[in-house]
From Swiss-Prot:
Belongs to the metallo-dependent hydrolases superfamily. HutI family. Binds 1 zinc or iron ion per subunit. This is Imidazolonepropionase. It catalyses: 4-imidazolone-5-propanoate + H2O = N-formimidoyl-L-glutamate. Its cofactor is Zn(2+); Fe(3+). 4-imidazolone-5-propanoate binds at residues 80, 143, 176, 244, 321. Fe(3+) binds at residues 71, 73, 241, 316. Pfam families: Amidohydro_1. HAMAP family: HutI. Keywords: Cytoplasm, Histidine metabolism, Hydrolase, Iron, Metal-binding, Zinc. Pathway: Amino-acid degradation; L-histidine degradation into L-glutamate; N-formimidoyl-L-glutamate from L-histidine: step 3/3. Its main location: cytoplasm. The keyword Acyltransferase does not apply.
Amino acid sequence: MAAWDLLFRRVHLATFAGDEPYGALRDGALAVRTGRIEWLGAERDLPREARAAQEIDGAGGWLLPGLIDCHTHLVHAGNRAREFELRMQGANYEEIARAGGGIRVTVIATRAADEAALVVASRPRLARLIAEGVTTVEIKSGYGLELSAERRMLRAARALGDTAPVRVTTTFLGAHALPPEYDGRADDYIAEVCDVMLPALYREGLVDAVDAFCERIAFSPAQTEAVFRAARALGLPVRLHAEQLSDSGGAALAARYGALCADHLEHLSEAGAAALAAAGSVAVLLPGAFYFLRETHLPPAARLRALGVPVAIATDCNPGTSPLSSLLLALNMACVLFRLSPAAALAGVTRNAARALGRGDDLGTLEAGKLADLGLWNVDTPAELCYHLGYNPLALRVFGGQISGAGDVAQG
């Protein structure tokens, strides 16, 4: 037989394929050729003639799919530390937003930054995720709120993916907030999003999916639906920030349009959960924002799972409500705050996160034919990835069949 490029021996495999927790296969081996998994199974079943250009002794560690952060606002300029101080003095998210703070503060800073500055500002956040075994990251626009600034954000996201060992998927979030120049004219702004911004950015190849923020401080269900119609006319998948602060019916709307996912969902109704289940949409839970905003209304994680809704977990990395660039910490938060099991939480940053990005066919599980994005972890059980605080047990990271890490992120 021809030599494999890479062969892992003496590893336990957490495949996340099938119905068993972790999809565990102990005392396993896994082989890679031309960037994809070619063989995996019990090490005793390796072909006798098996050989590889490079062999890795896993020393009894656990091999998992590369982690996926499926909801981030990673590209932005500035920070909102002052807003954090106000919140600690008693102001809430809605009060800050209605007083002209919140997202608009980041819009001002991001509009003032050129593409190169956005790349430089965002690269350390991406490097921290990569260092924790993340191999795929979703990055949204939404802090430009006009064509040229939204373009710069999406181009910066593409540039990050081109210069780092990570897959970046881009999401156009023009309907994130109402820019100040459109005060009192939300319908006019949505028309600009749908008729000008989205078509232009789509033609430039900058958009993989379209998102919106359906909430009383953002956009109505009718305005959100206009964005969805425009996306669907271009053949683009949709996703939605829904039911974070109130039950607006956004999840049911997302389900009606076959959305990849609906995200946040703290105030999700039974009808909304059932709609997501019927549509096959993923529920993306964001414990960082829940924690940072000191929310008390839990998303119905157990009910979602009982209904068969795939549950994903993400950092929601953003400057205002979740300045978090640690997916490992998000895993712990999901278990402690949302009462997910470690197996369910880890499925949420592998198999279900891939589904939330429409990449379930080639990412998120260890199966023959899938892309060889892998993490070798120096742990006795996969649950340790959710258990530890401030500790990263990653031993080795593989991206597209090549061993790589945060040190490979270009600094120029």
